[in-house]
């Protein structure tokens, strides 16, 4: 498998409730469109799914980049009509942060300290 095929992205999706609809109307729409079977599409994993009171739901998926359009189509097919949507493609910063922290500590121990921005 190529390294490109193994790469994934994170996609955070804000599903903002249409507040003109009550919960029963929202759930009815989602059931009628097959939301619970269709989303997320095969190959996309749920990294987190949270309810934010007064806003709606925030879903973060981990998926290969080639599935981005599939996720978009499923949102259009199933969620539109009860949710306004916003999408935020992201990446996992943990490894980068850990590397930067190690480099900073090493520079500090050597007395050179981290590079400081110029005023």
Where are these regions (language model features)?
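Short, compact, well-ordered microdomains
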Residues: 66, 71-77, 82
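Short S/T/G/P-rich N-terminal loop/turn motif that feeds into the first structured element of a domain
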Residues: 1-40, 50-56, 63-69, 91-119
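A short linear hydrophobic-aromatic micro-motif
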Residues: 42-49, 84
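Conserved short beta-strand edge segments in small beta-sheet-based binding/regulatory domains
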Residues: 79-92
């Amino acid at each position: 498998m190529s390294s490109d095929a193994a790469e994934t992205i994170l996609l955070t999706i804000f599903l903002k409730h249409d507040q003109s609809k009550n919960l029963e109307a929202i759930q009815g729409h989602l059931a009628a469109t097959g939301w619970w079977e269709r989303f997320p599409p095969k190959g996309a994993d749920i990294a987190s799914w949270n309810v934010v009171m007064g806003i709606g739901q925030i879903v973060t998926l981990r998926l290969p980049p080639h599935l981005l359009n599939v996720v978009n189509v499923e949102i259009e097919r199933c969620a539109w009509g009860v949710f306004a949507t916003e999408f935020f493609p992201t990446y996992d910063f943990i490894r980068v942060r850990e590397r930067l922290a190690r480099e900073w500590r090493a520079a500090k121990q050597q007395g050179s300290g981290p590079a400081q921005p110029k005023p």
